[in-house]
């Protein structure tokens, strides 16, 4: 079963708002075995909408449309539905009663004609009652395709998807099973991971597809199995995950879709009952921010010193001015001193330190733009690594932040493994 999601609104096309509706709808459809064939964003233009509907007719099983259901002149979806289905707008008594109660009872103001117009729906549609707002959803079928119209307001759309659309599709359509399994890897790029697992990937059964989802510092491998026998799919996924683990066990750190590196590091620290602190210069507290963003971080994250200026490194962290004069503020030696000193100050098992030149100009540093030194103080000594993350500034900061957590993760995994 295939679906297309259509978002209507000029505000999306000019970048004024971000379309989060399609993301939510696609996830909900995937959960019940409906494949999202495509996502389309179009303008508030009746002819454009009609052309889109005609193109999608019989191409997919379900077209879910969001937006354009408001009471103003630029909201044209209902009238367009009427034209496409050769129908007319009529007042739905239940919707009118709901709108009246909401406006007069809840908001305590007289109902206007624009409010009343929200109760106008195509006479042939199945009304999807919207308890969260005034605009009802609409369900209409033409030949082999169902067209569903939903309000664009996210919380109203979510209510109708969860309480009307999904239950109705489940009841009326037979669908295949879709099973996903996500493998989280850290520390190696997409091409290297692909090279390592090439033979394994080539031997996957036809009903299992593999997708590479790279992010800075990590690659997610998402396996998707589709078929009619759920037990067969689950067994095949599990067997292939086990064989994959035997190949890249050294870089697999989890199996949850949305698990981030800060979450993985947090779990490792908590499991080992270890603590961490940070001393940051070029990353400006971003490493600390990621660590602190995880629920329960207080169990292992003790604090941070953002020593952006040289005087902060000297006066707060206690880094020797002589050391800075000898090696420069952007150096392995200064990074190591920062890590050791914050580890001692906050009495943690591990400490991360960053110092570098993120650009856009060299400033007081002689280091090339993009140069970053990352130090990790451990119970057994200090590890320092030099990187050049290039440009622009934002990229340098983000990559240095992720790399810092990668280094910590690898060091902890040496103990765990």
Swiss-Prot record:
**What is the protein's given name?**
CinA-like protein
Family assignment from sequence similarity: Belongs to the CinA family.
Q: Which NCBIfam families match?
A: cinA_nterm, molyb_syn, PncC_domain
Pfam families in the cross-refs:
CinA, CinA_KH, MoCF_biosynth
Q: Report the HAMAP family cross-referenced here.
A: CinA_B (MF_00226_B)
Matching entries from SMART domains are given as:
MoCF_biosynth (SM00852)
Entries under InterPro entries matching the protein: CinA, CinA-like_C, CinA_C, CinA_KH, Competence-induced_CinA, MoaB/Mog-like_dom_sf, MoaB/Mog_dom
């Amino acid at each position: 079963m295939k679906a297309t999601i259509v978002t209507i609104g000029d505000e999306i096309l000019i970048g004024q708002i971000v379309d989060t509706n399609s993301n939510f709808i696609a996830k909900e459809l995937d959960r019940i075995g409906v494949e999202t064939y495509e996502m389309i964003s179009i303008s508030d233009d009746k002819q454009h909408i009609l052309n889109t509907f005609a193109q999608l007719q019989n191409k997919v099983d379900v077209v879910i449309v969001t937006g354009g259901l408001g009471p103003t002149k630029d909201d044209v979806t209902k009238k367009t539905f009427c034209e496409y289905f050769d129908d007319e707008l009529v007042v739905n008594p239940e919707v009118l009663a709901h709108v009246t109660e909401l406006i007069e009872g809840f908001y305590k103001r007289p109902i206007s004609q624009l409010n009343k117009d929200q109760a106008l729906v195509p006479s042939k549609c199945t009304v999807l009652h919207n308890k969260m707002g005034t605009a009802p959803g609409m369900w209409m079928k033409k030949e082999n395709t169902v067209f569903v119209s939903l309000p664009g307001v996210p919380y109203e759309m979510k209510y109708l998807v969860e309480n009307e659309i999904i239950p109705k599709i489940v009841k009326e359509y037979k669908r295949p099973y879709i099973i996903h399994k996500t493998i989280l890897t850290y520390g190696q790029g997409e091409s290297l991971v692909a090279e390592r697992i090439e033979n394994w990937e080539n031997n996957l059964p036809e009903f299992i597809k593999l997708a590479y989802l790279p992010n800075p510092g990590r690659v997610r491998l998402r396996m998707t199995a589709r078929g009619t026998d759920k037990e067969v799919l689950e067994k095949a996924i599990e067997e292939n995950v086990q064989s994959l683990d035997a190949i890249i066990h050294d870089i697999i750190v989890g199996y949850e879709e949305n698990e981030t590196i800060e979450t993985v590091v947090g779990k490792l620290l908590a499991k080992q009952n270890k603590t961490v602190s940070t001393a940051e210069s070029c990353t400006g507290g971003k490493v600390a921010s990621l660590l602190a963003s995880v629920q329960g971080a207080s169990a292992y994250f003790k604090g941070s010193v953002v020593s952006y200026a040289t005087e902060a490194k000297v006066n707060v962290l206690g880094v020797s001015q002589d050391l800075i004069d000898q090696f420069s503020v952007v150096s392995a030696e200064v990074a190591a001193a920062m890590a050791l000193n914050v580890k001692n100050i906050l009495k943690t098992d591990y400490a991360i330190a960053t110092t570098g030149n993120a650009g856009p100009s060299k400033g007081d540093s002689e280091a090339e733009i993009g140069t970053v030194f990352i130090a990790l103080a451990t119970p057994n000594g200090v590890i320092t690594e030099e990187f050049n993350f290039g440009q622009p500034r934002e990229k340098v900061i983000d990559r240095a932040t992720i790399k810092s957590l990668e280094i910590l993760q690898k060091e902890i995994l040496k103990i765990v493994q």
